[in-house]
A protein has these predicted regions:
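Polybasic/polar functional segments that serve as interface/processing modules
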Residues: 1-159
Length: 159
């Protein structure tokens, strides 16, 4: 049984567990030099792991096309100064929504769309020198929302 079946959602593709065996998955390890760097952020005298933006787009367009959504998130990541490592997007039926993620060297950007509600929920979590706010204009241009609700969370506050 598909994990989405109880929710009334049917996937066009098998789950990633069905598509890839453990032997086929790729694990990338960083070099020792990268491990030694401190990617925590300091802003207004507060040190933390990274900035997490929760972005709700209301009255948005272009929410059914995985290729368009992939390009939009890539443009947002690049504008924020992030390094894209990997992307994966999945198109659902019957409503046409898309869920996807870009794995970044600095964390991730993810999206879930509900085209039947003209709504998209986007998470942008970044550490280091990246500024997730710099990616917002690319998202506005790509999805042309009537309204944006934004919440900022500083993750992993240490001082």
């Amino acid at each position: 049984m598909n994990a989405l079946s109880p929710l009334g959602m049917v996937s066009e593709l098998p789950s990633s567990n069905q598509m890839q065996s453990d032997a086929e998955r790729t694990v990338v390890h960083n070099s020792d030099a990268e491990v030694q760097k401190d990617y925590f952020v300091e802003k207004d005298g507060v040190k933390f792991a990274g900035m997490h933006l929760l972005v709700d787009l209301w009255g948005a367009t272009n929410l059914c096309d995985p290729d368009h959504i992939d390009r939009a998130l890539r443009e947002a990541a690049e504008a924020a100064g992030a390094t894209i490592l990997h992307g994966h997007f999945h198109h659902f039926s019957p409503n046409g929504g898309v869920s996807g993620v870009l794995v970044l060297a600095e964390s991730h950007i993810s999206i879930h769309t509900w085209p039947e509600r003209d709504f998209a929920a986007i998470d942008i979590f970044m550490c280091g020198a990246c500024d997730p706010y710099d990616g917002i204009p690319a998202l506005k241009a790509a999805f042309q929302p009537e309204r944006i609700d934004l919440d900022e969370q500083r993750r992993g506050i240490v001082a």
